[in-house]
Amino acid sequence: MILSPVTIWKKFDLTQALNAETEAETLTPAGFVAQNVRLDGHLLAGGGRVKIFARFTKPHGSEAAPALLLLPDADDDGAELADYFAAKGYATLIPDYCGRRGGKGTGKVTKSDTAANEADAAKEEEIAAEAEKIAAEENTDGGKRNYTVYPETADYANYEVSGAPAYLESESVENSAWMEWAYVALYALEYLKTRSDVSKIGVSGVRLGGEIAWMITLSPDISCAVIVNAAGWRSHLSAPKWGAASAAGEKSQDAGEEADAVRAFIAGVEAESYAPFVKCPVLMCCAMEDTFFDCDRAYDTFVRLGNPDGSGIVYSADSGKCIGPYALTDIDLFLERHLKGRHIYIPKPIELTVTESADGNLEMTAKTDEDALVKTLSVYYAEGRSGQVSSCRAWQRVKIVAGGEMKDNRFTCGCEPFSGAEYAFAYASAEFVNGFKTVSPVVGKRLKIKGGDCVKERVISAGEKDGFAVADYRAEALGGIFLEKESMPETIAGYGGITGVYSSAGIRTYRINSPRFVADDGAALKMDLYSKEDTSVKITVETSERGTGGEYSVIVPVAGGGKWKRMVLRAADLKDERTGGSLEDFSKGIAIVIRPENENCPVPVANVLWL
């Protein structure tokens, strides 16, 4: 049998009775009505059915409301997201697909040598904490468990057993976690269809939940899909799209060296395989610093969509691993069109070409949708090396123009690459007059001509927010994924009216990982800090591309009042948070993170540079 989304779908049996039970209505923290729902799911070959636990939340009002089948990430219960969408007028059903997640002393997330599972492993502590919370609720209602119960014969579907494997045994596709998770979502969809207080139905998934959402978008009962930080290609996370690692990965596939289990995963689970068969419009929201997926390949999945009309894609470059306020606006407009029937035009993505001239300079030309009115167009640029992880780029806006400055929906600008850079990257982003925002693919180009005019930069930041993103997003973000405007990096004034960059969630820059900004051997790090009262900040240099260790930190005091305080740090001043060892050299760094110890005491940062 040739494995594909079509053959997978032929295996789904949704004919079994739901036997749904709804419990007493309660109020959410935001005052919306919610109910626990229990229903029967997949009938296993050996007998016994999956017992699905879900949470239904509805907006105020007596009329039938459009609904979202909401699939959060594995470490989130979705409660905040349910309140967020209820306030927008949408009902939500959140089925638990994880089952047992693994609590303290029992967590067992399987790992492999793949980068996909390396990235997942970094979240184990968060998932274990959520598991403890769920475990505490298990027996609060007459012994009923507030999570999905998989029969013993389907123990592999429990997250504590499976993790999120980037492989699939083709001989036993029906006995896989991915198949069971999709079954949970599909039976939850069947339940939503039975409710008289629900009208149109969409699906939204975040990270792991987003990968599952791709698998069910083939259903004709789904009107639209919002996919967040999930674009497939997880089997390729160890092989970046541009560079030596990518070339090596492609060679091994051509030579037939890729394991059958990984081939099966690509064909039967990965979003890039499902996209051509999708029946509904899709909005892809991509946080460019999230290591769960490869943002470089997100557009590759988007262009494969079988139903592109009314679909869209948007990036968030400065909101860390979260979706920022521009993407939230896109989500609102997208759902209003496809679930509420409003006449909202969704512009087509931007076309972007990047060419290298004879003198080594770059020319970038962006072309927007001819049927949409552009408010502003921005072009972003970054430099890097071969095989670099896409989430570690220092994006910089090199040009912003008003729509009236464009001719025939086109705009061209130039850029002078740093002579030591191996690759140049660019993308364009446009905001339209109706509020919708869309982007181009990320274009990567190996630089062939080494110009000599560009010199290395000592100044990492003079105090502008360009190049900085939110560091610790989870405490600030709705559902750990939606970041609203007040948490974004901002410039605030200190002594003498001089401005610096600040966020209550801390700020991170990957500029020290860029060839243009990398530290010379033996360099010291200098920055100016300002505070109105005595406080302290934690300065961290991260040395791992995927955030799985290698954090060297120091806490420095900042005296309140007076002038800006100058801080100078040597590499040896920063200590490994696990071993206590000193940082060897700043040139080993991937990112600098600056966190306020007191989030109620703003500490702007300016004049970050190498000495």
Locate the predicted segments by residue.
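N-terminal cap/lid segment of alpha/beta-hydrolase-fold proteins
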Residues: T15-S62
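Surface beta-strand/loop "capping" patches
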Residues: R337-Y381, Q396-D408
